[in-house]
Design a protein with these regions (language model features):
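Short, surface-exposed secondary-structure boundary micro-motifs
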Residues: 148-149
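Acidic-enriched and Gly/Ser
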Residues: 2-142, 158-167, 171-191
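Beta-strand residues that line the small-molecule/cofactor-binding core
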Residues: 152
Length: 191
């Protein structure tokens, strides 16, 4: 019987590895990623590490604990071929794969290696918390961000809740825009 239309049409580029976006149940992103990794499949959850402080009983000094916070909930990025995707859609912890609604034909949403690299860079930046908006941010000018190590990072400035705060965004067409608050002195106009 199978999954019917969820399997989709086999593309000519079925042997090329791409970043597909799988939808999983709420609060299972990390465990789904771990299961995929145990299966030998490259998987990524958009998350950031943060330190939390907890009261520790009678002690005066609070306990510090590092936690992994999921930024894009209910989604796991999986680096696989089309043939592998057809096998994984049968796994019980994967609800479905996202459809790319920007095309007329029914294709599955994929993220380029470059966009995934940029998203990982943003999530690795510890000075600010990355937020994710499932909205269409296409306005703003293209900028280069200084301070991501030796890597040059390019994105677009978006305005959110006021004109005085600058945000840098990475556009993932199927999901929206991941954005990070950046100090204006760290931005340079793209030439």
């Amino acid at each position: 019987m199978g999954t019917g239309g969820a399997v989709g049409v086999l593309k000519a580029s079925s042997k090329k590895r791409e970043w597909f976006i799988a939808r999983v149940s709420p609060n299972t992103e990390k465990s789904s990623r771990d299961r995929l990794l145990q299966m030998g499949v490259e998987a990524f959850v958009a998350s950031q590490e943060e330190y939390r402080f907890y009261k520790n009983g009678d002690r005066k000094k609070p306990r510090k604990k590092k936690v992994e916070l999921v930024v894009i909930t209910q989604y796991v990025f999986i680096h696989i071929t089309e043939i592998e995707r057809r096998r994984l859609v049968e796994e019980p912890f994967i609800r479905c794969f996202l459809i790319d609604r920007t095309h007329e034909e029914r294709t599955f949403a994929t993220v380029s290696d470059e966009k995934m690299h940029q998203l990982k860079l943003m999530l690795g930046y510890q000075d600010a918390q990355v937020q994710f908006a499932a909205a269409d941010y296409t306005i703003g000018e293209e900028v280069t961000v200084k301070g991501f190590g030796s890597q040059e990072y390019t994105g677009h400035v978006v305005r959110l809740r006021g004109d005085k705060t600058s945000y840098i965004g990475v556009r993932i067409d199927a999901l929206g825009c991941a954005y990070l608050e950046i100090a204006p002195q760290r931005l340079a106009k793209k030439q």
